């Protein structure tokens, strides 16, 4: 005759977080073993590609993991992939170059260079700094 199984938890529905499988114990009994969800690798914030060099884990496990398992040692490591970071660095460099060229052109034409206006502190912020 088949051995009957009793649930270890109260939830009886077959939901994503309540998957079970039957396991035989060393004592010969059949019991339910609750299966954990599959671990995933974090994705790039821009292109949604899996980040390489990061250990797959559940979000609740990540605070207990050491830093070297969660990131790679580079700017935006663990947030952006290498391709998106490269694009961002190049774009920032080109924008800076455009600003420099604009200033040089203005100097050649003899026009005074317009500087961005200074942000004045509000009365509240000024009183706090004193």
From Swiss-Prot:
Annotated TM spans: none
Pfam family, one: Ribosomal_L34e
A Gene Ontology biological process term: translation
Alphabetized GO MF terms: structural constituent of ribosome
Record has ATP-binding as a keyword: no
Top-level taxon in the UniProt lineage: Eukaryota
Region annotation Disordered: where it falls in the sequence: 111-130
GO CC field: ribonucleoprotein complex; ribosome
Keywords: Ribonucleoprotein, Ribosomal protein
Classification via InterPro entries: Ribosomal_eL34 (IPR008195), Ribosomal_eL34_C_sf (IPR038562), Ribosomal_eL34_CS (IPR018065), Ribosomal_L34e_arc-type (IPR047868)
Record family assignment: Belongs to the eukaryotic ribosomal protein eL34 family.
Protein name, entry field: Large ribosomal subunit protein eL34
Organism listed in the record: Aedes albopictus
Source species taxonomy: Eukaryota, Metazoa, Ecdysozoa, Arthropoda, Hexapoda
């Amino acid at each position: 005759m088949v051995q009957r199984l009793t649930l270890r938890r109260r939830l009886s529905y077959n939901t994503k977080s309540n998957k079970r499988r039957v396991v035989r114990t060393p004592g010969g009994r059949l019991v339910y073993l609750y299966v954990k969800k599959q671990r995933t690798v974090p994705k790039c914030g821009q292109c949604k590609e899996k980040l390489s060099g990061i250990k797959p884990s559940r979000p609740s496990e990540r605070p207990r993991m050491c830093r070297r398992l969660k990131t790679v040692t580079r700017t935006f490591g663990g947030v952006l992939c290498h391709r998106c970071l490269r694009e961002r660095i190049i774009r920032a460099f080109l924008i800076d170059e455009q600003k420099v060229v604009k200033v040089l052109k203005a100097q050649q034409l003899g026009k005074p260079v317009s500087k961005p206006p200074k942000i004045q502190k509000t009365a509240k912020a000024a009183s706090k700094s004193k």
